[in-house]
Amino acid sequence: MGSFDKAKWVWHNSYRGKNVYVNFEDKFTLKSAPSSCKVKISCDRSYALYVNGEFAHCAQCSDYEDLKFYDEVDITGHIKPGENELFVTVYYQGVSCSTYRCGEPGLIFEVIADGGVVCASSERTVAYKNSAYESGEGVEWVTVQLGIGFHYDATREGEREGEKYADIVEKTYDIRPRPVKLLKIEPPKSAGLINKGVFFDLADGTPAQKMQAAALAVQYVCGSLPLPSEEGIKLSVEGSYKGHEPDGVFAIADLGEESTGLLLLDLEVPHECDVYVGWGEHLADLRVRAHVGGRNFAVKYRARAGRNAFFAPFLRLGLRYLELHVYARECTLYYTGVRPTVYPLPEPAEPPITDGLHKKIYEVACRTLQLCMHEHYEDCPWREQALYTMDSRNQMLCGYYAFGETRFPRASLELIAHSLREDSLLELCSPAEVAITIPSFSAMFLVQLWEYLDF
């Protein structure tokens, strides 16, 4: 049986603009629990998959409209006898950047249990807008490389705006298996709260601009307070302030090392309020540098009264530090951090050195390389996460030695090759549409190919 023999590309045609999130629901019934159950899934730009209310996976291998890939996700552990529910949220950015080449919106999936298709996307799949995510032009870009950030309103969860059966849309059915391994989405990374206090807004603008300009009044923290915390860490306005009252409480968490992952929040507030979350790699400003020359390394979360647990599956962060600005006079923080996203690799080769310092440099270099490997090589884990020929050439050379595998570099080379333009130059990044290109980077691609064959 071929891939997607019974499935159709679906969408909700009322939501075809920029920066939209659409939910899809389907059901299937099994007499008994299968020994194996998998989902084959593809979309434009990324998806989050849930089975029977449990998170199963999120991703989308970087591809092109005429070179589509699908993921195969094992959901056996989520399946039960009787009726099973499949829930998918798809994020469609609808505008190209350095890490995404815009295609037509669409989702396709098949559920295969013990070798047979038991559920497939079709005109009977239910579709509706995910209203918790703000859609449209009002959400700021993180960077021109990464694309658009997000504003999420937890008070709007459960809305089913525009609910109807899905529309069938035209996209290619020549969909290939993901050329690289699925990422491991790990449990929450341990962190430590290293600073807290109150903040005073001094500027308007995006969440990142407001965080960067805010005045901070620090409260004493003894060392680092571990996160996650079962009992929670109390944040509150203490004492009185002359003049302007604080706008809320803040906290800074340290993940202990450079990391890549998906944002996870767990906090409790007495009333609805905004929570700004900024991230960065250093604290040179005595805070996270959330706003850098028009770039916005912060997102907005609207918390409902009470306990809030939030997982953000569509934007991978590169960071060491997280900063929260909570627009309330008190808050209990149980966790802020990430679920690391890790590309599975063998243990690095042992270097022929015995000196401790040089061995440490080698270990850090191997970890840095892995932090720049997800769907393809990335020039950096934080600001761009983009595939360039010149950058990836050096990464490939290091990877051949350190990890001894060629599957990942081959996939990146194929993505680059598919970006060939009408003027016989390559796009600056792949897959992407960028206003400029660098001719010498196109020339370097030939060197990469030769080195791939040589190694």
Q: Could you say what each language-model-derived stretch is?
A:
Residues 394-405, 445-455:
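Well-ordered alpha-helical scaffold segments within catalytic/enzyme domains
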Residues 387, 399, 413:
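Functionally critical mobile loop/hinge segments
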Residues 1-382, 391, 407-412, 416, ...:
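Extracellular/oxidizing-compartment recognition motifs
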Residues 432-437, 453-455:
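The substrate-binding groove and active-site-proximal loops of carbohydrate-active enzymes
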Residues 44, 387-391, 404, 436-447:
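Aromatic- and histidine-enriched alpha-helix N-cap/loop-to-helix transition segments
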